[in-house]
């Protein structure tokens, strides 16, 4: 459980506390400047492959769950190899948030890289999310839904987002001081990824406002949601945390 409800600045100790679920989130201020975010917005909206799993979100890139778990592992890695050159060009004309974050993590002493799957190659890592609506209460935790994938061996999972375009109202991040357990699945809404709000009833929650150019990292095994918002654009991925302290990024 959390020691407090504070959002800590990025450091090796704060990231360790987040992995251990002792704090709600970590913030990296001024991760990218306005020129960089504007360039990335333009490139993503004009050139990125668009996929969508729910009405409220247009994904600029692919998802291991949607294109992998719900279709096949072969399909996901085939798409990943197809999109790698496309996103390399996007980053060449703007910048790569994924590689910048990996560099920041390495400077803090973490063994960080793109996740790979034995016999399949590297995962796709980093996609945009154009949000029009809200995100209901849910978790993102590979051991819950991806048993046959290497990411299921992680002891913890983080999610990070770089906020590119943030409207004046809405789009707050809600995080609860409760981590998913198998028994919670009785609250999962049939045929959907999200949960009835009863799963977090009477649980401590923090509400985070976000700003363009900053990164928020959370423990994605914790229940979280996003409040109603129009035309918000973010970019990020997951980070699997393994027993040997390796951090591996994937989407």
Question: Where do the protein language model's features map onto the residues?
Answer:
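Generic detector of solvent-exposed, compositionally biased contiguous segments
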Residues: 1-17, 128-136, 140, 202-217, ...
């Amino acid at each position: 459980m959390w020691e407090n409800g504070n959002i800590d600045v990025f450091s090796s100790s704060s990231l360790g506390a987040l992995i251990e679920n002792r704090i709600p989130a970590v913030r990296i201020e001024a991760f990218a400047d306005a020129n960089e975010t504007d360039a990335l917005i333009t490139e993503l909206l004009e050139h990125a492959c668009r996929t969508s799993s729910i009405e409220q979100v247009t994904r600029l890139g692919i998802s291991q769950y949607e294109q992998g778990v719900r279709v096949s592992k072969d399909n996901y890695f085939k798409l990943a190899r197809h999109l790698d050159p496309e996103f390399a060009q996007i980053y060449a004309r703007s910048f790569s948030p994924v590689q910048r974050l990996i560099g920041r993590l390495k400077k803090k002493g973490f063994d960080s890289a793109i996740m790979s799957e034995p016999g399949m190659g590297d995962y796709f890592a980093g996609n945009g999310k154009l949000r029009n609506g809200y995100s209901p209460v849910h978790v993102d935790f590979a051991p819950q839904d991806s048993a046959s994938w290497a990411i299921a061996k992680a002891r913890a999972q983080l999610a990070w987002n770089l906020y590119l375009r943030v409207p004046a109202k809405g789009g707050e991040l809600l995080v609860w001081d409760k981590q998913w357990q198998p028994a919670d699945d009785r609250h999962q809404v049939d045929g959907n990824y999200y949960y009835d709000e009863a799963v977090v009833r009477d649980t401590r929650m923090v509400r985070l406002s976000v700003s363009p150019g900053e990164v928020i990292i959370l423990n994605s095994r914790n229940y979280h949601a996003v409040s109603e918002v129009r035309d918000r654009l973010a970019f990020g991925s997951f980070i699997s945390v393994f027993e040997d302290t390796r951090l591996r990024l994937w989407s």
